[in-house]
């Protein structure tokens, strides 16, 4: 009986651990299929033989058969006949231009690759969160162990492109409509914000898509009095593919960790939208200090992020752990109070979406 019980225990243990193993196998195959556009060459309707698919994608038939067997077994692909493959609803979402395909690639580069260095990283730095932006798992994984996130992106153009695409898409995922009332800015622009001062400065605003959404919902804000501050290479990219609605916006190259250009002083609003969670505490304090130094008495600083709550779901926790790879961290309302205070600012209001953890934390001069 003891032997039988032991066998059952081993099987149960392997079944539990094996589930993680199989998830990794599936993820790895998905990444290969996405990289080589295998899903794109399967007809949206009907089926294709593995041999024909291998010819179209310049793949070895035997390897493609092994990989596709797994995706059929996991119901990602269908096999209407032996050695035939067809799409399912799931697999259609992994074609090149689909969001899911981009997400898989993003997770691989910004989470799985750095995660593979965790053993070495924690052995060297101790079992603690990154405290220095230039000592991060992502740097270790990409062969740039002394670079921060943006130093890595500067040396890895492909990763930079993927990161910027993800940042741009996040504007649509977390719309601000109805969350924060910009009506006060209308009166401020008319009464006491000087004509030479910006209405809104979007710090880390990338291609300006979040600002575009904001201006569409608040047409009283003159676009010519708005600015985006981001790294010079990001600004250059943005200006090469500028949306027509953003032609009047000023795109300025720079860093939030350095003194802000004079043209950005005394703005009505300084906005950090899904930016600060990518940074370690000391850099957030420095960025807020740089803004505080150029604030006018009427200026407001908006931090737009997901707030950590005790009730957050598994996916939100996963995102928090993922940004650890480049020194980032999701933070609670109490965390923002503390960071603002250390930068000489104070939290005035917190506006939250009831259905998500998305919030606007409004700061002013202390």
UniProtKB/Swiss-Prot annotation:
The keyword Phosphoprotein does not apply. Pathway: Secondary metabolite biosynthesis. Disulfide bonds: none annotated. InterPro entries: COMT-like, O_MeTrfase_dom, SAM-dependent_MTases_sf, WH-like_DNA-bd_sf, WH_DNA-bd_sf. Pfam families: Methyltransf_2. The keyword Transferase applies. It comes from the Eukaryota. GO terms for molecular function: O-methyltransferase activity. PANTHER family: O-METHYLTRANSFERASE ELCB (PTHR43712:SF16), PUTATIVE (AFU_ORTHOLOGUE AFUA_4G14580)-RELATED (PTHR43712). Methyltransferase; part of the gene cluster that mediates the biosynthesis of the trans-fused decalin-containing tetramic acid phomasetin, the stereochemical opposite of the HIV-1 integrase inhibitor equisetin. The PKS module of phm1 together with the enoylreductase phm4 catalyze the formation of the polyketide unit which is then conjugated to L-serine by the condensation domain of the phm1 NRPS module. Activity of the Dieckmann cyclase domain (RED) of phm1 results in release of the Dieckmann product intermediate. This is Methyltransferase phm5. The gene is phm5.
């Amino acid at each position: 009986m003891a032997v039988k019980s032991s066998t059952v225990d081993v099987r149960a243990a392997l079944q539990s651990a094996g589930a993680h193993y199989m998830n990794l196998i599936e993820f790895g195959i998905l990444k290969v299929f996405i990289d080589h556009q295998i899903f794109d060459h399967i007809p949206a309707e009907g089926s294709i033989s593995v041999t024909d698919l291998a010819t179209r994608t310049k793949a070895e038939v035997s390897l493609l058969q092994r990989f596709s067997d797994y995706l059929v077994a996991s119901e990602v692909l269908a096999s209407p006949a032996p050695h035939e493959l067809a799409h399912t609803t799931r697999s259609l979402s992994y074609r090149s231009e689909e969001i899911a395909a981009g997400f898989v690639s993003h997770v691989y580069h910004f989470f799985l690759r750095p995660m593979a260095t965790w053993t070495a990283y924690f052995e060297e730095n101790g079992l603690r969160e990154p405290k220095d932006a230039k000592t991060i798992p992502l740097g270790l994984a990409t062969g740039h162990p002394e670079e921060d996130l943006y130093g890595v992106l500067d040396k890895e153009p492909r990763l930079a492109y993927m990161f910027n695409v993800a940042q741009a898409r996040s504007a649509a995922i977390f719309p601000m409509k109805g969350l924060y009332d910009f009506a006060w800015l209308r009166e401020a622009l008319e009464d006491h914000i000087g004509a030479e001062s910006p209405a809104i400065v979007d710090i880390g605003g990338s291609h300006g898509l979040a600002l575009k959404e904001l201006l569409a919902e608040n047409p009283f804000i003159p676009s010519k009095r708005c600015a985006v501050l981001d790294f010079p290479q990001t600004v250059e990219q943005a200006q090469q593919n500028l949306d027509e609605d953003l032609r009047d916006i000023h795109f300025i190259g720079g860093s939030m960790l350095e003194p802000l250009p004079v043209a950005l002083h005394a703005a009505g609003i300084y906005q950090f939208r899904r930016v600060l969670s990518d940074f370690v505490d000391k850099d957030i304090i420095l960025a807020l200090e740089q803004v505080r130094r150029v604030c006018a008495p009427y200026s407001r600083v908006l931090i737009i992020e997901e707030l950590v709550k005790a009730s957050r779901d598994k996916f939100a926790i996963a995102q928090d752990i993922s940004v650890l790879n480049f020194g980032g961290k999701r933070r609670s309302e109490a965390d923002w109070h503390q960071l603002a205070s250390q930068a000489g600012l104070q939290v005035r209001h917190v506006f939250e979406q009831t259905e998500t953890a998305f919030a606007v934390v409004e700061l002013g001069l202390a």
